[in-house]
Amino acid sequence: MLILTRKVGESLLIGDDISITILNIRGNQVKIGVEAPKEVSVHREEIYHRIRDVKDEQQL
């Protein structure tokens, strides 16, 4: 796992077309912005797991 330190307003890039920007830090919460092409799905981890679980159930 790559671990990076960023400040508010700073970004990191994934590949050529995904940008993640730190928008705000308050206590133990970090607000981030994600810019990605429309064909790239972006989900919070817990939502992704729900989507995957529903798809798995539908295949049974």
From Swiss-Prot:
HAMAP family per the UniProt record, alphabetical: CsrA
PANTHER family assigned to the protein according to its UniProt record, in alphabetical order: CARBON STORAGE REGULATOR (PTHR34984:SF1)
GO cellular component labels: cytosol
Organism this protein belongs to: Histophilus somni (strain 2336)
Protein name: Translational regulator CsrA
Family the UniProt entry places it in: Belongs to the CsrA/RsmA family.
GO BP of this protein: mRNA catabolic process; negative regulation of translational initiation; positive regulation of translational initiation; regulation of carbohydrate metabolic process
Key words of the record: Activator, Cytoplasm, Repressor, RNA-binding, Translation regulation
SUBUNIT field: Homodimer; the beta-strands of each monomer intercalate to form a hydrophobic core, while the alpha-helices form wings that extend away from the core.
Tree of life domain: Bacteria
Pfam families assigned: CsrA (PF02599)
Protein role: A key translational regulator that binds mRNA to regulate translation initiation and/or mRNA stability. Mediates global changes in gene expression, shifting from rapid growth to stress survival by linking envelope stress, the stringent response and the catabolite repression systems. Usually binds in the 5'-UTR; binding at or near the Shine-Dalgarno sequence prevents ribosome-binding, repressing translation, binding elsewhere in the 5'-UTR can activate translation and/or stabilize the mRNA. Its function is antagonized by small RNA(s).
Subcellular localization, as worded in the UniProt entry: Cytoplasm
Gene Ontology MF terms: mRNA 5'-UTR binding
